[in-house]
Amino acid sequence: MAHCKTEQDDWLLAHLKYLLFIFNFFFWVGGAAVMAVGIWTLVEKSVYLSILASSTFAASAYVLIFVGGLVMTTGFLGFGAIIREQKSCLSTYFCLLLAIFLVELVAGVLAHVYYQRLSDELKRHLHSTLTEHYGQPGAAEITASVDRLQQDFKCCGSNSSADWQHSVYILSQEAIGRQVPDSCCKTVVARCGQRAHPSNIYKVEGGCMAKLEQFLADHLLLMGAVGIGVACLQICGMVLTCCLHRRLQQHFY
């Protein structure tokens, strides 16, 4: 027959439950934040995907959504384990926390590796995309992506506005005398690209390449910051879960 221990043990058990409950709430919020970053990436920045030659950028967003959903699901399970005070549920909760922590660790290493890959990919393909595919039949999505890129980042050309001088579009009759696309203009009006003066178009050192690389670096930093925050919470959660599990073992004997 099980016997309860002293009131002091009851006090410690109650406070451990409260601490773990608070942790689990912030852990769940962290999972929601991770998922939100992934969804934001797909919804707001998916226009740039056609510029890239691979699905690396999109894959990172789907990974964030998956991990965020897994964290939120684990959070719900954690609430149930804490309320029911079942050691088996706490053990399962601990294993899930550990598994997610290991997944985040691997994802962090892969993010660092694939960032360099993505950067190299941009350098290889952005220039050819602008000069060979912009404004061409069947490339409406690429054209829209490049226009959005130049307007959002206030840039012109992959490395400079001079890149457009070798563009198939600018050399064609469809350009109607434009020196750069209208999306290079500070104020976009019809045929404003006919005048490639610094007062009229964006002249940015490094062009859109530098701007897009900075965007990717900032995006990776955001993902890293959210990931580190959630990982730190997980370490605290695993410690608290072990303490609560041990206290439950000692509370009844």
From Swiss-Prot:
Coiled coil: none annotated. Keywords: Membrane, Transmembrane, Transmembrane helix. This is Tetraspanin-11. One of its GO terms (cellular component) is plasma membrane. The chain crosses the membrane at residues 19-39, 63-83, 93-113, 220-240. Belongs to the tetraspanin (TM4SF) family. It is a multi-pass membrane protein. Pfam families: Tetraspanin. Gene3D superfamilies: Tetraspanin (1.10.1450.10). It is found in: Membrane. It comes from Rattus norvegicus.
